[in-house]
């Protein structure tokens, strides 16, 4: 029970001027870690929210709120990253404990980057507005992860804690594991009960809930729990809002899952009760590391989008969490534009010309399933003209973006697979739709457009040795070379050779 003093303090903290961590503080469950790329989570916070590194010269900068307690300065990011690419290298802890999140190291599983590290997220994959002010979330493709194995003040053993995260309920998969929360300090699986983290996705390998997902569950290691029992729990609903509030808390022989729409309404309780009655989960053996986008052993096949989240000391009351939800709703999250450059019109037929000096007579075409560049002109054969012409359709995975259907092979689209661009028939799956959706960006060399992958926003259409890839600006693949990257990912949009 709250004292009258705490209830009054909580009421004051729930005003729009307060941040989520002010509310937790008023409820005697202070934040020990607070992460967001979109806004300050304390009313007085004016420090760095996150660090960027740009691809043109590897220079870094930090992005802070426009005002204390306010929204991130997206214009500073846009200026810093103009005509190049940017990665989010650090997500700073606002709590003062120094629990910053950086590129996750290898563990039980290696990541795809150099030396087994996970990938870093693109800085532009999740644009939003908060009360009309532009900001960017953290769009995390499979293989992307952040971690802190030396966190301070987080719960260990069976100590009580709470956490929440604002996530995208439309961006998920069934792989392990899109988590935010408490994990092992070794980046390896050290046994049941060694984690307590929010999970969002539609995995059914361990626990699952009602409907087809995604579900908010709790990753306690060696199991995702949707309720008291292993496997199915009907009380855990599918939750697919564009902005989801996921709240989890755990203490001695008790834990809870709560959730709701981060843009409106209140939180619902999906489970609140005793710990799972299976070996290792009562008491818990939490280790206190912090993860984002991955499992405790660096399982990194999941995808999702993170906007903000905190971890607390102590078991927050429902009243505190309800007030935090009111604060989140008052922030007025709205999805932003994924398109920044010359766009397309659904239904038009186009040809896309290379702008790299010395290659400007070449167009994106295909030979069977291989997407490549070929020299095409008015005297070319009808067959080649058709192979170099593309029907633009509304993005199969996201209606803001576009997909490109072959004129000579109707029903087949450009998609990435192992980061090669291929022409494949649409099989109707979620995976294909995501692989075949691309978002026009301002051209990196100033000519035409640059087309980035919706599902891997660090990767763009790139011609390399006359073959098309989904390439990043630097990376482990030969086609990720930084040499001539801006030219190689910029294409002029021209009238199609065939329709």
Curated annotation (Swiss-Prot):
User: Which BP terms from GO are recorded?
Assistant: arabinan catabolic process; L-arabinose metabolic process; pectin catabolic process
Q: Please give the pathway this protein is involved in.
A: Glycan metabolism; L-arabinan degradation
Quote the function comment for this protein.
Answer: Able to hydrolyze 1,5-, 1,3- and 1,2-alpha-linkages not only in L-arabinofuranosyl oligosaccharides, but also in polysac-charides containing terminal non-reducing L-arabinofuranoses in side chains, like L-arabinan, arabinogalactan and arabinoxylan.
Gene3D superfamilies in the record: 2.60.120.200, 2.80.10.50
Q: Which reaction does it catalyse?
A: Hydrolysis of terminal non-reducing alpha-L-arabinofuranoside residues in alpha-L-arabinosides
Q: Which Pfam families match?
A: AbfB, ArabFuran-catal
MF terms in GO: alpha-L-arabinofuranosidase activity
Query: What EC number(s) does this enzyme carry?
Result: 3.2.1.55
Induction remarks: By growth on polymeric substrates and L-arabitol.
List the signal peptide residues.
1-18
Instruction: Name the chain's protein.
Output: Alpha-L-arabinofuranosidase B
* rRNA-binding among keywords: no
Record family assignment = Belongs to the glycosyl hydrolase 54 family.
Q: What are the alphabetically sorted keywords of the record?
A: Glycoprotein, Glycosidase, Hydrolase, Signal
Q: Which cysteines are joined by disulfide bonds?
A: none
* Species: Aspergillus niger
**InterPro entries in alphabetical order:** A-L-arabinofuranosidase_B_cat, ABFB, AbfB_ABD, AbfB_ABD_sf, ConA-like_dom_sf
Record: glycosylation sites: 83, 202
